[in-house]
From Swiss-Prot:
Protein name: 2,3-bisphosphoglycerate-dependent phosphoglycerate mutase
Protein function: Catalyzes the interconversion of 2-phosphoglycerate and 3-phosphoglycerate.
Organism: Cupriavidus necator (strain ATCC 17699 / DSM 428 / KCTC 22496 / NCIMB 10442 / H16 / Stanier 337)
Keyword entries, A-Z: Gluconeogenesis, Glycolysis, Isomerase
Alphabetical list of SMART domains matching this protein: PGAM
EC number(s) on file: 5.4.2.11
């Protein structure tokens, strides 16, 4: 049996402000840093360890991983920073307040933009300063692969090559893997692992800073999965994530 741990980054500054973030590189709040440290403690107390870590190229996920590694005394393990694990690109919604956007366009439209499988938000213009073409962290990414908006289907399409070519082989070679990433890149992985339908994925939310442990068979099919931590607090966190895109 293999184990895989997925962790969404701790609360970010734009999570706190209820803004669409996507590829904008905002940092953790102090609450988010505390969540990440607590995640590391939970993993250590559960007797889990890691041989390799994966994260995105965005600091809120990177710093979350740092706190987890520090709490577990695993700062030395190799880390792969992969743009394919970035948050879904929210296009022209990046930086907008979710509740204000819902008040303008309606809760239903914002839910479609946030959670539907194949409907992207309005795209950025290529000349928009929020576009990532000139960002040095994507210097080796072909220009046509750098998005101006994404739906979850697009996020799955960029995450799965990394799973197939790197993450899955690492797991099957016996390495213990942790992935610190983002709500939608983790939703993409969970959709694949649990074979969630395109319709049902709309209802899946991922809480900040909470370790999600998968136990996998030899073919990397899930035997079970569970969150570490206080289950009532996790339920409250999931409810809070679900309500972010509603008009106040």
């Amino acid at each position: 049996m293999y184990k895989l741990v997925l962790i969404r980054h701790g609360e970010s500054t734009w999570n706190l402000e209820n803004r669409f973030t996507g590829w904008v590189d905002v940092d953790l709040t102090e609450t988010g840093a505390d969540q990440a440290r607590q995640a590391g403690k939970l993993l250590k107390d559960a007797g889990l360890g890691f041989d390799v870590a994966y994260t995105s190229v965005l600091k809120r996920a990177i710093r979350t991983l740092w706190h987890v590694q520090d709490e577990m005394d695993l700062m030395w393990i190799p880390v792969r920073n992969e743009w394919r694990l970035n948050e879904r690109h929210y296009g022209a919604l990046a930086g907008l307040n979710k509740a204000e956007t819902a008040a303008k366009f309606g809760d239903e439209q914002v839910l479609v933009w946030r959670r539907s499988y194949d409907t992207p938000p309005p795209a950025l213009e290529p000349t928009d300063p929020r576009a990532s073409y000139d960002d040095p962290r994507y210097a080796n990414v072909p220009r046509n692969e750098i998005p101006l908006t994404e739906c979850l289907k697009d996020t799955v399409a960029r995450v799965m090559p990394l799973w197939n070519e790197s993450i899955a082989p690492d797991i099957q070679s016996g390495k213990r893997v942790v992935i610190a990433a983002h709500g939608n890149s983790i939703r993409a992985l969970v959709k694949y692992l649990d074979q969630i339908s395109d319709d049902d994925i709309v209802g899946l939310n991922i809480p900040n800073g909470t370790p999600l442990v998968y136990e996998l068979d030899a073919d990397l099919r899930p035997l079970r999965h569970y969150y570490l931590g206080d289950q009532d607090a996790i339920a409250a966190s999931l409810a809070a994530v679900a309500s972010q895109g509603k008009a106040r």
